[in-house]
UniProtKB/Swiss-Prot annotation:
Changing residue 246 to I: In strain: CB4854. Changing residue 238 to N: In strain: Bristol N2, CB4855, CB4857, CB4858 and KR314. GO terms for cellular component: mitochondrial inner membrane; respiratory chain complex I. Core subunit of the mitochondrial membrane respiratory chain NADH dehydrogenase (Complex I) that is believed to belong to the minimal assembly required for catalysis. Complex I functions in the transfer of electrons from NADH to the respiratory chain. The immediate electron acceptor for the enzyme is believed to be ubiquinone. This is NADH-ubiquinone oxidoreductase chain 1. It is found in: Mitochondrion inner membrane. GO terms for biological process: aerobic respiration; mitochondrial electron transport, NADH to ubiquinone. InterPro entries: NADH_UbQ_OxRdtase_su1/FPO, NADH_UbQ_OxRdtase_su1_CS. It is a multi-pass membrane protein. Belongs to the complex I subunit 1 family. Its EC number is 7.1.1.2. It catalyses: a ubiquinone + NADH + 5 H(+)(in) = a ubiquinol + NAD(+) + 4 H(+)(out). Keywords: Electron transport, Membrane, Mitochondrion, Mitochondrion inner membrane, NAD, Respiratory chain, Translocase, Transmembrane, Transmembrane helix, Transport, Ubiquinone.
Length: 291
């Protein structure tokens, strides 16, 4: 029991430390894409930039809006962080000390629940910008989650288990591109970052959050980004650090290269293109592996 608790604490420290350096890496890549250096002034090559940014955030003042509560401002980001943290326990072969049989179903429950934290955070902020961002995130989640679940079901049929299996699946590569598009939508990253549209929503659902609350939302966002990079590497390419790093870099380059998609085109893409493709692929894998 003590060993399991120690492993859980160490994993949390590992995730937080990874986020600190991954954000620095993202800023350098975004700087390179725009022909600038990125953060390089704080210590050697800017390595302490993320740590000092965190200290600066914690020193900010939290202004709680009228008709809202301070408890909800900490509770909702805390739940968001816990959901992100629980996602890591579904990874294959990495955390066997608490592994369980139906990790894929647990994973689908978590990503379905994660949108509620975004919705509630927009509601408790008592801001029209936060509310619009939360509604956008909810409608976006409804549009892609059905197709995303069907793609995950294709993986279950292929592997014949309800766990994520870490191996190189050549026959699964045909669904990797639509799966990656769904992952980008799940992460609310560009070009599907409608819940955080700066031009029309200031900051989106988290516009009123600061200090610890904003840090928890930030950690949950980038923790999920790292998680999906590792998960994609494990499911499609037999997990390697290089492939996980490459997928993460690809997600950053997509952010730096593509403008925000139009909202109606995003809905059309998920409902009229990716959803029918997911149904066809599900039937294809069912026929191939069961008949």
């Amino acid at each position: 029991m003590i060993l399991v608790l120690l492993m859980v604490i160490l994993m949390m420290i590992f995730i937080v430390q990874s986020i600190a350096f991954i954000t620095l890496y993202e800023r350098h890549l975004l700087g390179s894409s725009q022909n600038r250096l990125g953060p390089t002034k704080v210590t050697f090559m800017g390595l302490a930039q993320a740590l000092l940014d965190g200290v600066k955030l914690l020193k900010k003042e939290q202004m709680t809006p009228l008709n809202s509560s301070e408890v909800s401002f900490l509770l909702v980001p805390g739940i968001s962080f816990v959901v992100m943290y629980l996602e890591w326990f579904t990874l294959p072969y990495f955390f066997d000390f608490i592994s369980f049989e139906y990790s894929v179903l647990f994973f689908l429950c978590l990503i379905g629940f994660s949108v509620y934290t975004t919705l509630i955070s927009g509601i408790v902020s008592k801001s029209k910008y936060g509310m619009i961002g939360a509604i956008r995130a909810s409608s976006q989640s409804i549009s892609y989650e059905i197709a995303f679940s069907l793609y995950v079901l294709c993986i279950i049929i292929h592997n014949n288990v309800f766990n994520f299996v870490s191996k190189f699946n050549l026959s699964l590569l045909i669904i990797y591109i639509p799966f990656l598009i769904m992952v980008i939508a799940e992460l609310n990253r560009a070009p599907f970052d409608f819940s955080e549209g700066e031009r029309e929503l200031v900051r989106g659902f988290n516009v009123e959050f600061a200090r610890v609350a904003f840090v928890l939302l930030f950690l949950s966002e980038y923790g999920s980004l790292i998680f999906f990079s590792v998960l994609s590497s494990a499911m499609f390419f037999k997990f390697s650090i290089f492939m996980a790093f490459s997928i993460f870099s690809l997600l950053i380059f997509i952010r730096s290269s593509y403008p925000r998609y139009r909202y109606d085109l995003m809905m059309s893409l998920f409902w009229f293109k990716l959803l029918p493709i997911s149904l066809i692929m599900l039937c294809f894998y069912a026929v191939i592996f069961y008949y």
